[in-house]
UniProtKB/Swiss-Prot annotation:
Natural source organism: Pseudomonas entomophila (strain L48)
Sorted UniProt keywords: Carbon dioxide fixation, Lyase, Magnesium
Annotated GO MF terms: magnesium ion binding; phosphoenolpyruvate carboxylase activity
Name of the molecule in the record: Phosphoenolpyruvate carboxylase
SUPFAM superfamilies: Phosphoenolpyruvate/pyruvate domain
Function: Forms oxaloacetate, a four-carbon dicarboxylic acid source for the tricarboxylic acid cycle.
Cofactor(s) needed: Mg(2+)
Enzyme active site: H137, K542
Listed EC numbers: 4.1.1.31
Enzyme class: lyase
UniProt lineage: Bacteria, Pseudomonadati, Pseudomonadota, Gammaproteobacteria, Pseudomonadales
Length: 875
């Protein structure tokens, strides 16, 4: 065992011991002993030395269910804190820096060696356009209150690592840890009520306030340092390689709770939050910048003030206060904005820039490059609107709205027209100067909501909004329809209208749709920037399995790159990835480097899912590491793109995809018992009842195809079968080996980043899958006639593991990554009891109707949250 593993185990042991003390104080020694017995039984079960755990949990009294679930949930959260702390800070002086810290300096050296000049490198880095789009997520059940306590626990782990602590100081740290853990234990960790979209948006703002606000300027300092050491050039002040957008409060696809009024409220809350955060910065800077010497340009603004910097910052502070007050008042109803209210980001940036330039001009660069520079970087990155809010709606809602309008106008039903007639009508109306809608038109509620959303977009400042994303887009008319609805609402500025291609068929059709759109007269002239296209990962994987979906996504991107190049239009690909492999998730750095050549081009946009936001961006140090990885990967994919795949690789990938989709659909669609087995063996039915997010877990009606991708993945993840992430690969790879293509598979894995990344992610998810746990759910929950199907699926899981081991030449999955393996093993100690307890709770819940606020249902929700926390990339 390495020293780093030992220290992690020591931290986990300490935190667990302190939690045990807290539990003993509330529930007594006998209850704590029961927890210990369950933990030891879980270890024995995993070693195959006994099967006591299920019977122990089955004997639990009703009143013990919730505290037992809470105990193991808290153990897992504390283990996660220790692990995250280790990933950021733990390194002996003789050990190399972690990869995340080295990745950019090493890349810049490689780029220079490959012939890229200093000026070109600096120019490309400064021009990078990386947009991370924060999305709400039903499985992110951790409350903001607890997240803040967990951050404080991480800070105390850092404090106890100081080597010069005297015993009394070390004891103080331990007492603070004990108090924080007690506070966390006595705080209810789950919501009793479903969060609203506004709650979700506030959660996203809290991540910015508590982590990204600090992480972004720290990250940019390191980027600037790496660039200067490599090229002698600095990162320009106006450069913001990574910016943030959000779907929280803008994503109304399938969520009737996200209304035009909600979107307006979230936009105002973002402005309030931005003003409040910058006020804190300005208060600090005004206290610091007491200097008297100033440049002529600054003096022109403030006259002969004895404290010119403070005088200028006071003007900005007054305007920020006015902005905050206006945003707060506007939440109650529309308010006129005075001239003092800040609307243009330049009005925020310019005073800070003037102070910065003046300090440098007066020989005080060391002061300029301190907290002032950090505030300036924040102003450029976050601005007055904090994040750009995307709007997302289903294409069918726009078609229905236009059908009602054309029907009212006596033109027939838009939905009944063919594509050519739709395009002809839309193009004519887009050029028409008269309104399409008469003033007295009274639409039905759903159409009225679509039109109200468009009016909110037209009324909002351009810099507060990102893209209008059309889910389930399938034709060029879907894009023009939104453009027309926005025009009718009074939008006169350009806004990116983005088709989202999601299913396997839609991905295959993405090229022809964009070819048609870009070929329409006048369309390209109205772009005002790159053509953005969104690639959906979740629904395509649910539709066809990850083997076929991954290849369809790759081919769709290749086609889009080619078509945009032919039309001389720049392309921005927006990747709709989930947190899990089954929804396109996985390590971002490897995923970006595995994109088709030419598909990145200095621009990259991706969703960051709720439960992964906390793990990737919840602590400033972790956030910095992930920002480094994104920036380095996009720069490398832009300047050192991978070569196109060899014809033989493409041919084999075609075959793998065909075999994979056939095997996947053979189980998921063609087996008449599959849906019933899924509903019995996983908590899928219960997930819809639990208060896990503002969006319903199901679309309106139907079977598996009606399920949203998140509960589909989430149900399988909770039982550790992880089926959506691997089903289909076992057959596809086995068939290739049977055809004698082992050498070709090895070559693809060695030389083709796309294929290597797929296999690496498959291996990672197989290492987290657990047939023993999945079987325990079956034994407790599934009717005897369906048990053979469960056994068959576990056989397929075993086959997947064996074929991946054969492909990688290892004896154990993840043998090449012992640290990851250690993290998984460490968490299994606490996960195993939660899984077994969840199966017991599901069995009890299904045998009777339990109220949502009953201890049984509350305990079930805690197990869902705990397993999600333990497995990280959950749903």
């Amino acid at each position: 065992m390495s020293d780093i593993d030992q220290r992690l185990r020591e931290d986990v042991h300490l935190l667990g011991e302190l939690l045990g003390e807290t539990i003993r104080q509330q529930h007594g020694e006998a209850f704590l002993q029961k927890i210990e017995d369950i933990r030891h039984s879980a270890k024995a079960d995993r070693r195959g030395e006994g099967e006591q755990l299920s019977s122990t949990l089955g004997d639990l009294a009703e009143e013990d269910l919730l505290p037992v679930a809470r105990a193991f949930n808290q153990f897992l959260n504390l283990a996660n804190i220790a692990e995250q702390y280790q990933l950021i800070h733990r390194r002996d002086t003789d050990q190399p820096e972690p990869f995340e810290a080295r990745v950019l300096p090493e890349l810049l050296a490689r780029l220079k060696a490959a012939g890229h000049g200093n000026d070109a490198l600096a120019r490309q880095l400064a021009r990078l356009d990386i947009q991370l789009v924060l999305t709400a997520h039903p499985t992110e059940v951790a409350r903001r209150t607890l997240i803040q306590k967990y951050d404080a626990i991480a800070a105390q782990l850092a404090a106890q690592d100081h080597r010069d602590l005297i015993p009394a100081e070390r004891q103080q740290v331990r007492e603070r840890l004990r108090r924080l853990i007690a506070e966390a234990w006595h705080t209810e960790e789950i919501r009793r009520t479903r969060p609203t979209p506004v709650d979700e948006a506030k959660w996203g703002f809290a991540v910015i306030e508590h982590s990204l606000w600090q992480a972004v300027p720290n990250h940019l300092r390191k980027v600037d340092k790496a660039l200067f050491e490599a090229t002698g050039l600095r990162l320009p002040l106006e450069s913001a390689p990574v910016r943030f957008a959000s779907w929280m409060g803008g994503d109304r696809d399938g969520n009737p709770n996200v209304t035009a009024a909600v979107t307006r409220e979230v936009l105002l809350l973002a402005r309030w939050m931005a003003a409040d955060l910058f006020l804190r910065d300005i208060d600090y800077l005004a206290a610091e910048l007491s200097m008297q010497q100033a440049s002529g340009a600054l003096r022109e603004q403030v006259g002969d003030s004895a404290e010119p910097y403070r005088a200028l910052l006071k003007q900005l502070r007054d305007r920020l206060r006015a902005t905050r007050a206006w945003a707060h008042a506007s939440l109650a109803g529309p308010q006129p904005a005075s001239a003092a209210v800040l609307v243009d980001n330049r009005d925020l940036i310019a005073p800070l820039e003037l102070c910065y330039q003046s300090l440098h001009a007066c020989g005080m660069g060391v002061i300029a490059d301190g907290p002032l520079l950090d505030s300036l970087r924040r102003a450029v990155t976050f601005g007055l609107f904090l994040v750009r809010l995307d709007v997302r709606q289903d294409a069918a809602r726009h078609r229905d709205a236009l059908s009602e309008i054309t029907d009212y106008l006596g033109l027939g039903r838009y939905a009944d027209w063919d594509e050519e007639r739709r395009i002809e009508f839309l193009q004519h109306e887009l050029k028409n100067r008269r309104p399409l809608l008469p003033a007295h038109f009274k639409p039905a509620a759903e159409t009225a909501e679509v039109l109200a959303t468009c009016r909110e977009i037209a009324a909002a400042p351009a810099a507060s909004l990102g893209s209008y994303v059309i889910s389930m887009a399938g034709a060029a008319s879907d894009v023009l329809a939104v453009q027309l609805l926005l025009k009718e609402a009074g939008l006169t500025r350009p806004m990116r209208v983005v088709p989202l291609f999601e299913t396997l068929a839609d991905l295959d059709n993405a090229g022809p749709v964009m070819e048609r759109l870009l070929g329409l007269p006048g369309y390209r002239a109205g772009l005002h920037g790159p053509q953005e296209v969104m690639i959906g990962y979740s629904d395509s994987a649910k539709d066809a399995g990850t083997t076929a979906a991954a290849w369809a996504q790759y081919r769709a991107q290749e086609n889009l790159v080619r078509i945009c190049r032919e039309h001389q239009v720049e392309l921005l690909l927006f990747h709709g990835r989930g947190g899990t492999v089954g929804r396109g998730g996985g390590p971002a750095h490897a995923a970006i480097l595995s994109q088709p050549p030419g598909s990145v081009g200095g621009r990259f946009r991706t969703t960051e899912q709720g439960e992964m936001i906390r793990f990737k961006f919840g602590l400033p140090g972790i956030a910095e590491q992930n920002l480094n990885l994104y920036l380095a990967a996009v720069l490398e994919a832009t300047l050192l793109p991978p070569p196109p795949p060899e014809p033989a690789w493409r041919a084999l990938m075609d075959q793998l995809a065909a075999d994979g989709v056939k095997a996947y659909r053979g189980v998921v669609r063609d087996n008449p018992e599959f849906v019933e087995y899924f509903r019995q063996s996983t908590p899928e039915q219960e997930l819809g009842r639990l208060p896990l997010g503002s969006r319903p877990a199901k679309r309106r009606a139907g079977g598996i195809e009606s399920l949203r991708a998140i509960p589909w993945i989430f149900g399988w993840t909770q039982t550790r079968l992880m089926l959506p992430a691997w089903l289909g690969w076992e057959t596809a790879l086995s068939n290739a080996l049977a055809r004698g293509q082992a050498d070709l598979l090895a070559q693809m894995r060695e030389q083709w980043p796309f294929f290597r990344t797929r296999i690496d992610m498959l291996e990672m998810v197989l290492a987290k899958a657990d047939a023993q746990i999945a079987e325990a759910y079956d034994q407790r929950l599934v009717q005897p006639r369906l048990l053979p199907l469960g056994a068959h699926l576990r056989d397929l899981l075993s086959q997947s593991c064996q074929v991946v081991l054969g492909l990688t030449g290892q004896q154990v999955l993840l043998a090449h990554s012992p640290e990851t393996l250690e993290f998984i093993r460490l968490r299994n100690t606490y996960l195993d009891p939660l899984h077994r307890l969840q199966a017991e709770l599901l069995a009890r819940s299904r045998s009777r109707e339990a109220a949502l606020d009953s201890p049984l249902e509350q305990a079930l929700l805690v197990t869902v949250a705990g397993i999600a926390a333990g497995l990280r990339n959950t749903g």
